[in-house]
Amino acid sequence: MKIMAGLDKPTSGEIWFDGKNVTGTKVQKRNCSMVYQQFINYPNFSVYENIASPLKITGIKSDEIKERVGKVAELLKLSAMLNKKPDELSGGQQQRTALARALVKDSDLILLDEPLANLDFKLREELREELPKLFEDRDCIVVYATTEPSDALMIGGNTATLLEGKVIQYGKTLEVYNKPENLISAKVFSDPPMNIAEITKRGDNCKFTDNDVQWKSSAKIKDGTYKICLLYTSDAADEG
């Protein structure tokens, strides 16, 4: 995300945005907003000043600034805290302030690095519903990094599953969820976590690789060694 924002340089490759190569574009010329997992606010500014800061440097009139700050503050439950300083806020309130500062600006690109991670459960659930609606009204691209499958499903759009910086699968979120192309993508959306076991198939016989448990299988697959997902359901538990 820092590379997309222009804060870090790529070691290789290029960055394209809206059909343009922006690899060498300076940070100041990238109309981008970013929220880190760890909140970052100006300690000497009030909540209002923190949220309004990206608007003031663009020369927007004070009345419009006040209106925009008011709307995003109401959305993020910050209206009663606009005159407070960051050190007077809880961790969740500080994260909401950082999120409000990113949303108040008409950015072409919004980068969100687990923005709901430090919020309490109730507000997290509320924002999961509100954020997609907010993004729909904006003519911008939103990149949302998360380790929570429920966040990805609620936000919608397209999803890329990553492993060690490499894209494993990319597509519509529901397509990735319903039709994972590999075990890694399947694990991402697995709740509860999957139980993975290695088996060996010879003819109609299957057995676990690490023990002597065997069974008959009519699966139409070639003989060989495979990894399978074991599903434990409440019905199976009831049957003992």
List PLM regions with ranges.
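The feature captures the helix immediately C-terminal to the Walker
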Residues: 1-2
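Helix-to-loop junction immediately C-terminal to a conserved catalytic motif
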Residues: 5
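A position-specific signal in ABC ATPase nucleotide-binding domains
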Residues: 8-9, 56
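Conserved coupling/switch loops of ABC nucleotide-binding domains, chiefly the family-specific signature
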Residues: 11-14, 164
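Conserved ABC transporter NBD signature motif
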Residues: 13-21
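ABC ATPase nucleotide-binding domains
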Residues: 31-33, 37, 41, 45-182
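ATPase nucleotide-binding modules
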Residues: 181-227
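Conserved small/polar residues in nucleotide/adenosyl-binding loops
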Residues: 232-240
